[in-house]
Amino acid sequence: MGTALSHFRTAPSSRGSGFEYGRAGLMSDVALELSPPIVDNGLSLVETDQVLPAERSEIVSRVLNVVIASLALVVLLPVIALVALAIRLTSRGPILYSQVRVGIDRRYRSKQEYDRRVYDHGGRLFKMYKFRSMRVDAEADGNAVWAQKSDPRTTVIGKFLRKARLDELPQLYNVIRGDMNIVGPRPERPTIFAQLRADIPLYAQRQRVKPGITGWAQINQAYDSCLDDVKLKVLYDLEYVSKQSLSHDIRIILMTLPVMLFRKGGW
């Protein structure tokens, strides 16, 4: 399922501990929060600290993301048109669906990340777009619910869109706007983000890079339908944050294609 996590770039903490992944048992107080132990895949959180994003040119990254997203929109325009038509013909409601998501949090650069305000969202909020794959009354009660691999709330065409990951195509527009990158941790809704930040140590440090349409966690792990699934994805997300590079992004983009074609992994 992926390689063991290693070579993290970290910052020293007040305790003087380091951040390391390996095959050893779960030993730190943070690791205890990740119980039951995740050892099946050779991944385990041994000791934690602040995970710092690997350095890379923001300008080059931005240009690359805009170019790829723009080209993808042009090439995939016929697919986008067919998907929009299929949604319109098979279910009532809008073609596009938007949700507020939690984006990048740059406060770690000024050491203000943990000087939280009362209504701290954990990152810059933005509106993320998707092709609608659920019934219009899927969340009529207003409560945010985790998406599942076989979600009963999805429409007939929505099931196919999710399996092929075509429902994510409108997020190419989010990339052009600067809300997201092609590659990065998947953004979460504010209510679910707040819950996960409270339950999972280091979860908020995923926000130190822009969220993405696809990511290292998505090509290595299936749909997260429970807290334990999210905990495993956090390991992959933090590895990406620490080792991000343009070459790694290209690799993940190429690895995403078979995930879409053969319906492996998950968003």
What are the language-model segments listed below?
Residues 91, 226-229:
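Flexible acidic/glycine-rich loop/turn elements at helix↔coil and beta-strand↔loop transitions
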